[in-house]
Amino acid sequence: MAINVRPKETLATFSVSSIGTGVAQTVRPGGSTHVIPVDAAPAFGGRDSAPSPISYALAALVSCSQVTAQIVAKDLGIKLESFAFELAADLDTAVLVGGSRDADANFERVSVDATIR
């Protein structure tokens, strides 16, 4: 049995633009005044002056989870007070650091512990 809590299907385009040198860059979300600084740890050729792309990817996972939970809860008439997430992900750095063609550049395991009140 399928339940459609959002009767109208919509498509939204999201965009970003960036400028940078080396592994550091400044990302600007389209239609926003926000600026997202990005850098990498020295092991990846950066200066660690800002969160890494991996940190932002993991932050996006928990942030999207919270936003999605809040939207679905609202549609179902459920009030959610607070969220706490702990996320861990395994990544084989052989591709990123060593250029290995035998390794997988994707997260191998992602675990999320969420506490929702």
Question: How would you name each of these model-derived features?
Answer:
Residues 1-59, 69-117:
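Extended beta-strand/beta-hairpin segments
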